[in-house]
Structure formats: structure tokens, C-alpha cells
Curated annotation (Swiss-Prot):
Site feature location: Transition state stabilizer: 25, 32
NCBIfam families: ispD
Lineage: Bacteria, Pseudomonadati, Pseudomonadota, Gammaproteobacteria, Moraxellales
Function: Catalyzes the formation of 4-diphosphocytidyl-2-C-methyl-D-erythritol from CTP and 2-C-methyl-D-erythritol 4-phosphate (MEP).
HAMAP family documented for this protein: IspD
Pathway: Isoprenoid biosynthesis; isopentenyl diphosphate biosynthesis via DXP pathway; isopentenyl diphosphate from 1-deoxy-D-xylulose 5-phosphate: step 2/6
The protein, known as: 2-C-methyl-D-erythritol 4-phosphate cytidylyltransferase
EC number annotated for this UniProt entry: 2.7.7.60
């Protein structure tokens, strides 16, 4: 185990990895989390990164017909749990939280991380968890928006330039206490709110969420070209 902040090593930490999505932008037939980078699948790389933290366990929310995930060589496989995913990412996360609530305390912390985000660094993970625990507040990794943003109309014509001064691009992991996050997602779904990440659910019930500086190389594999980029990033980080 690499050097951890004291609070991190003393806290019960869990992880949830929603991995039931079809990833239609990547391929109509192939799942991006099961593509190979070197000798391991994307999701194995992702779990390996998260396992640098002293996790009590992690839950993979997978498709109902998925028989492949359980055959993979996950890091600390004795800590792996599996549950059925849902129609959307938010439903997969909620299913995993419902699973966790049977084996964990509602005041335990949970990191929710994209299955197709295998390049997150230990330093970012450690800082995220430390900040959340020290402030007793939910947190996400994020980076300030760098590029100029344009708002366009339906004809793809620019209407105005959007100020990026206070805009951050959300990443994962996103960390919260299990009970609070579960309540936030349940409430948001009940109110038919559009939930794109955990922070948006937490915001909807008035929870404060802090941003912790991430890194631009914490990419999410979305398109086939991203696989090669992820391979190069992992190679350079190692």
C-alpha cells in the first residue's frame, strides 16, 4: 500500500463501479470496459487503480446477461461484489448502493467511479478522500474548463460565448457517505430529475459538494480512439 493520509487509512471506504452501460458512442456491439489495453481489460485497470486505496470492498454493477465480468482477474478479488445494473447509470449506482447498505454502514464513505476511466492517479484518489474526510463533505475530482465555450442554436450557429471563469469539468471518482448519496439519488429519481452524476443528485437535495483538482489525463474512454490514448497515458504513468 502506498503512503496514505492517516484519516484515509482509518476510514471505512467502499467503491461502486457502474459497468452495465452499452457505451453506444464507442460501439454498437462491443463494451468499452471489456476492451484490452496491453494484457488487461479497461475495467481491470480501473479496479487496480481504485485498489491502491484501502477499500473494504467494491461493487461492480453489471448487465444482467454479463457472464464475463466475474471471470476477470480483478485486484483484491476477494473484495469484489457484483450486482445487477440498471437502465441508466444512475439506476446502476442506486442498485449498488442498495447492495452496499446490506453490508456497510450508512456513514461509511463510497467512491463512485466510471468503469471506463482507468488512468486516475493514486495522488488524485488520496487527495480526494482526504479532503472529503477532513471537511466531512462530499467531493468530486474536477478540472477547470480550459477551452472557450460556445452556446449554439439548433442550426449549429453560435449564439454567444459562455464565460468559463467559474466552470469546472466534472470527473470521477465522486465521494459521499453511503446514506446521503442513496437518499439523494432516490429523491432525485422520485422527482423525475435528470441525474448525470452523483454530484447532481447531491446538489438537488441541498448537499454541499466540493471540487478537488483532478488531472487532464484522467480521461473517460468514450470513442474507439480513446483506447490508444489511454494506453499511452498508462504507459507514461508507469
Amino acid at each position: 500500500m502506498r503512503h496514505l493520509h492517516h484519516q484515509t487509512s482509518q476510514t471505512k471506504l467502499w467503491a461502486v463501479i457502474p459497468a452495465a452501460g452499452s457505451g453506444s458512442r464507442f460501439s454498437k456491439t462491443e463494451l468499452k470496459q471489456y476492451q484490452y489495453i496491453q494484457d488487461a481489460t479497461v475495467i481491470e485497470h480501473t479496479v487496480k487503480r481504485l485498489s491502491q486505496l484501502p477499500l473494504t470492498g467494491y461493487v461492480l454493477a453489471i448487465g444482467k446477461q454479463d457472464t464475463f465480468a466475474s471471470t476477470l482477474s480483478f485486484q483484491d478479488k476477494h473484495k469484489a461484489h457484483f450486482c445487477n445494473g440498471g437502465v441508466e447509470r444512475v439506476h446502476s449506482v442506486l442498485n449498488a448502493l442498495n447492495y452496499l447498505s446490506q453490508i456497510a454502514d450508512e456513514d461509511d464513505w463510497v467512491l463512485v467511479h466510471d468503469a471506463a476511466r482507468p488512468c486516475v492517479t493514486f495522488e488524485c484518489l488520496n487527495t480526494l478522500v482526504k479532503n472529503a474526510i477532513e471537511t466531512n463533505q462530499s467531493a468530486i475530482l474536477a478540472i477547470p474548463v480550459r477551452d472557450t465555450l460556445k452556446q449554439v442554436n439548433q442550426e449549429q450557429q453560435i449564439e454567444k460565448t459562455v464565460s468559463r471563469e467559474l466552470l469546472w469539468q466534472a470527473q470521477t471518482p465522486q465521494i459521499a457517505k453511503i446514506g446521503i448519496l442513496k437518499k439523494a439519488i432516490e429523491t432525485a429519481l422520485k422527482n423525475n430529475l435528470t441525474i448525470t452524476d452523483e454530484a447532481s443528485a447531491l446538489e438537488s437535495i441541498g448537499e454541499s459538494v466540493q471540487v478537488v483538482m483532478g488531472r487532464s489525463d484522467n480521461i473517460k474512454i468514450t470513442y474507439p480512439d480513446d483506447l490508444e490514448l489511454a494506453r499511452l497515458i498508462l504507459q507514461s504513468q508507469n
